[in-house]
């Protein structure tokens, strides 16, 4: 028996390859027992692969690998860690899991792969995780999920997929998976079908669906009915309509079947976001993103009726334009100016100006395919196509463009100076694409742009000076991206009136050099970010308080620390958020400012969070010292001045005596040369040199 054990251990070591040894015995990682469980902590060890390491074989353990560089997981990656019961792989930059990577982890019940860069779950991605009950994959770049991705997880109960880029769930994705808790917040879901999706999770006890762009049409009717039939407290949060316009901001549970699916013979009064796209392509005036006096109420996103109350959840800027439905008559219209319209597109005259060319949903893969090139096109719609990149050469013939819609394509690359020829462009839609970086060079030439929509991309970085190329920009839509910070002076030289930053990853925003440049802002949406309610957020809180609720859309909820989780930090006092700062204040000084909760706005990198009515010791002591030094220098200066004046006075007296002696000597000399006494004015003055001594 002993021989068999030795042979088994030898074969395992041989199969493992060049194993360096036990990560605990060789103290490569920190191994400690906590409440009877062994924790193998390999945080931030710089691991790029695990195939050369092993772990204790005599007991079960929790394996912590967060903060390493495990960017790819290959088959049998964890073959030497078969006693692990939980696996934590957060913040590894992980972007690919090769099927078979988890083979050998039959005992793992909890898998944490959140905060990485995973883009897809393929079939057999989780092969080997036979006992998995808990899967956390939030804050990734997840777009595609194979229908068979979870088919091997027959014990999975908790699935956390929030804050990804998921726009749809495939049929039968939950088949044979006993899901009880499902988190889909912060994705791109517009609808959830009942058949082959929702019907497969009958045991649901908790579901989260907030912060998705729900399209409240007939397709969402099945979701509404399903939510009404699950346990009363199963739905956590709200399902808020983002489209159509007439239902935007309304809770799904407050809608009726008639709201979601009006009769066909009734007119749907909702219109897409500015500029409106008419379904029949009838000639009409060029739409604008702002409502002016006399315009139709339905075509004014962001407008508030006179005397009405602005509803935070009904911010019209969130709406994405929807493609118009090209009717048969539109498709068969005669050629414009004797030239045929590009294949599959429809062209119309805009009264008093140029042409409107609609190529929405025409399977266009490149703008170079649009032939023949028409002159004087002012509105170009290319939404819902398959365009992957755009180049400067694509717009050489479109220098008169005023509106360009490239939304919902596959655009990941914008060549520098692509728009340099579009000097008259005022509206640019690039939402629902794959952009990850914005720079000044990409938007060079857009000197008249007023409206830019880049929501629902994968933007992680905005370079300094990006928006300086657009001095007339008024509306900027950046929501539902992957932004964690903004560069200094990002809004310098731009007079934004409306800004959307909701559903990103901001933990705080600096005031100095960023928010303080929004001097013309009238609407800003910041909800759905993981705010860290600590001392660093206090200047931002004060800035938000000055804006007021009529400018700041929606509430701002804390993500951390735990004691403030999901609390609106606008309702928290500064002392609650940053108690250690106020503990340093002199009791005497704080007694005079108990009612003050404002803080000095010095940016998030400063420790001066106190209101101007409060004076800390660190400010008071240097101030008093400065006064003392100034007074001392003043006294010394006065003494020096007095002493100098005295010396000058003595010098003048000495010079006066010397002058008299010289004068007397001159008189005596004069009498000598005249061989007798000198008489001044005859008998009035007589100097007898013989009777005076020069020493007198």
UniProtKB/Swiss-Prot annotation:
Main localization, broad class: membrane
Domain LRRCT: 212-263, 529-580
Modifications the protein undergoes after translation, according to the UniProt entry: Undergoes proteolytic cleavage that results in shedding of the ectodomain and cleavage of the C-terminal cytoplasmic tail. Glycosylated. Phosphorylation at Ser-695 is necessary for proper function in promoting neurite outgrowth.
Tissue expression pattern: In the adult, significant expression is detected only in the brain. Broadly expressed in embryonic brain with highest expression in subventricular zone, subplate, cortical plate, pyramidal cell layer of hippocampus, thalamus and hypothalamus where levels are highest in ventromedial hypothalamus and medial part of periaqueductal gray matter. Also expressed in mantle layer of spinal cord and in lateral and medial motor columns.
Region entry Disordered, spans: 268-317
Protein name per the record: SLIT and NTRK-like protein 1
Gene Ontology terms describing biological process: adult behavior; axonogenesis; endocytosis; gene expression; homeostatic process; multicellular organism growth; nervous system development; neuron projection extension
Record PTM Phosphoserine, positions in chain: 695
Ranges for the LRR repeats: 59-80, 83-104, 106-128, 131-152, 155-176, 178-199, 376-397, 400-421, 424-445, 448-469, 472-493, 495-516
Subcellular location: Membrane; Secreted; Synapse
Signal peptide: 1-17
Organism, scientific name: Mus musculus
SUPFAM superfamilies documented for this protein: L domain-like
Residues that span the membrane, as ranges: 623-643
Lineage top rank: taxon: Eukaryota
